[in-house]
Amino acid sequence: MAMKKLLIASLLFGSATAYGADGFVVQDIHFEGLQRVAVGAALLNMPVRVGDTVSDEDIGRTIHALFATGNFEDVRVLRDSNTLIVQVKERPTIASITFSGNKSVKDDMLKQNLEASHVRIGEALDRTMLSNIERGLEDFYYSVGKYNASVKAVVTPLPRNRVDLKLVFAEGVSAKIQQINIVGNKSFSSDELLNRFQLRDDVPWWNLTADQKYQKQKLTGDLEALRSFYLDRGYARFNIDSTQVSLTPDKKGIYVTINITEGDQYKISGIDLNGNMAGYQSEITKLAAIEPGSLYNGTQVTKMENDIKNLLGRYGYAYPRVMTQPEINDQGKTVKLHVNIDAGNRFYVRKIRFSGNDTTKDSVLRREMRQMERAWLGSDLIELGKERLNRLGYFETVDVETQRVPGSPDQVDVVYKVKERNTGSLNFGVGFGTESGVSFQIGAQQDNWLGTGNSVGVNASKNDYSTYAELSFTDPYFTVNGVSLGGRVFYNDFRADDAELSGYTNQSYGIDGFLGFPINENNSLRFGLNYVHNSLSDMLPQAAMWRYLNSMGEKPDYKSKAEFKADDFALNVGWTYNNLDRGFFPTSGVKSTLNGKVTIPGSDNEFYKVTFDTSAYYPINDDRTWVILGRSRLGYGDGLGGKELPFYENFYAGGSSTVRGFRSNNIGPKAIYMNGKDDPKKDSPSRDAVGGNAMAVASLELITPTPFLDSKYSNSVRTSFFIDSGTVWDTYWNDSAAMKGSGIPDYGKPGNIRVSAGIALQWVSPLGPLVFSYAKPIKDYEGDRSEQFQFNIGKTW
């Protein structure tokens, strides 16, 4: 039977011919070439059905419709009598997608890019999309300065009409900026202007933020910084006329020319406030206090706008609009600011919702909120809630947004989105020094037990000099008003001689508890009681120990080891101020604690101790990746009623939490072992640390972006350069002529300050916080022991 060709068409690969006959009635439709696509699915996409009278136009629409499905590379429609024969060539199915040579672009990002273009495993391959993807990726590389980059899509046929898709990258090298020229600057030198650029044609080794590799995005940011520089200095007519970026023939060098018009400096002639200010005109007027006669300042204007928005936001106006229109008088060189304000609607908060807290219970987050549901929205209260969630330390990131309630003109929902971090830690520490070798400790802590916000700790350690066990518990919301309750029980068998401290053994155990009372958002008080039993033995005849025992009415024999037991009850009082922006890796704010301890009647000892700790963070750039950290710790203790502070209550310094680069607890007075009762010249100085009843430690730290690390990890990794200093002294020390004659240092002198400098890396790992530091002593004294590299898990600051 002869087959008549009605139409052969392929929109992409073939041609079309018209069949001049009149239309005919379709009695059957037959497909050839279908493999993956079902007949029923193909029929559903055709505008022609059995029984229809079709024409050439209908056949053309059929071909268009089948191509539009994206399933076919070629479509041909034939007629055999009254039967339509549809011959198709299906597009191959993507069996796998791989990447090769991509270093600057991660696989996940590439997969997202392909997904957006509907290129994924199991889908039909549209070859026309591949060229668009190649061009798009190459354009990305050009935008980051890699003009030699090329991207090729390699398609490998497989059986059953399947293909492997491989994107092959040749990234090349980034073009380096050879020169940046600014043309038109008269009031400021090019060097002064270029110092504000991230892109530089000459990068000093010490400048970690500048970059000689061209990136279009960074150039855009630099141009904005240049514009802000002039606008902040009164140049209201400043303009960037043009920017030329020229490429060297080998595509490895870039020349940038920026043409500017500075204009003249303009002064503020006045401010005019207009619009709907929702009754807060007097308060807004105070915020718009830019002095007439002062130079026009773009940043100051932006700050004024934001301050007005924040003010209105505090009173429930969630979406105020504030726009400043400068009226420039070129003749008088003045600018009048017309500030147009529209407060908009006042909003209630319908609901406060949380997302991302898979472990932490909603109630734990909700109790940190200061914005109430069914109350007027307060933008300051919403931000305070975000700040309080950050301070908990349970979350890596906290974001908040207000969402309008559909169909309601005056209601919003507040949604806090959190990303939880591991709040449990395996506390384990290792230190290594040229003299100390390796030290080790282990424990466990969970700061968000079962998502309740309660803290539970179980710590146990055993090493050459100590066997220690502790169980602790804290409920930060023992009452709904935020009163906290906590306590611990502990046991410690400590052999000081094995720890290179003054020789004695102390078996102690005890229990303590406390209640914490919030005063306001940043201040809290803590009151507690504790009981400790100390059983001292194997005490060698050492000056500080014997002096303490004498004050307790004991008369130990110089020729034998002494023993002593004491049961003490103490009252603990503490104050904390905390306005840090977050619990882990703060970038701004201050945290200070003042703690006092005094024994109460019924105790064998009579003494008090006071410590003051403070940490202050000061960001030095807008995105808070560069931060200055200042830390200090002061401590003092003394006896009461003629008794001395027990030597085992002394302060110590040295190690990862005080003065890095020195052996733990090694800074300060050393043991003087007495060989003769009345002749100090026969006493023996040693290198064993005994601590002192007074201490001062200070540290200055520069926190920087971690080199070679993606910025998205900045909430879990932190690098810093530091200088530590500290001293420990003994105010009971008698620096007699006999002591000097025997070559014993003056341990009562607070000026024996140790100093070290180094670098630290902190990482909040799945195991818990890891801290690495390398430091070298700059100032040390005879008898000090160094420990350059220190490594701990379970401690951050």
Curated annotation (Swiss-Prot):
Keyword Repeat attached: yes
Presence of keyword Repeat: yes
Protein origin, superkingdom: Bacteria
Coiled coil start-end: none
GO cellular component: Bam protein complex
Function: Part of the outer membrane protein assembly complex, which is involved in assembly and insertion of beta-barrel proteins into the outer membrane. Constitutes, with BamD, the core component of the assembly machinery.
Signal peptide residue numbers: 1-20
Organism annotation: Photorhabdus laumondii subsp. laumondii (strain DSM 15139 / CIP 105565 / TT01) (Photorhabdus luminescens subsp. laumondii)
Subunit structure, as described in the record: Part of the Bam complex, which is composed of the outer membrane protein BamA, and four lipoproteins BamB, BamC, BamD and BamE.
Residues in POTRA domain copies: 24-91, 92-172, 175-263, 266-344, 347-421
Phylogenetic lineage: Bacteria, Pseudomonadati, Pseudomonadota, Gammaproteobacteria, Enterobacterales
GO BP: Gram-negative-bacterium-type cell outer membrane assembly; protein insertion into membrane
Chief location category: membrane
Protein name, as recorded: Outer membrane protein assembly factor BamA
Pfam family name, one: Omp85
Compartments it resides in: Cell outer membrane
Keyword entries, A-Z: Cell outer membrane, Membrane, Repeat, Signal, Transmembrane, Transmembrane beta strand
Family annotation (NCBIfam families): OM_YaeT, PRK11067.1
Similarity comment: Belongs to the BamA family.
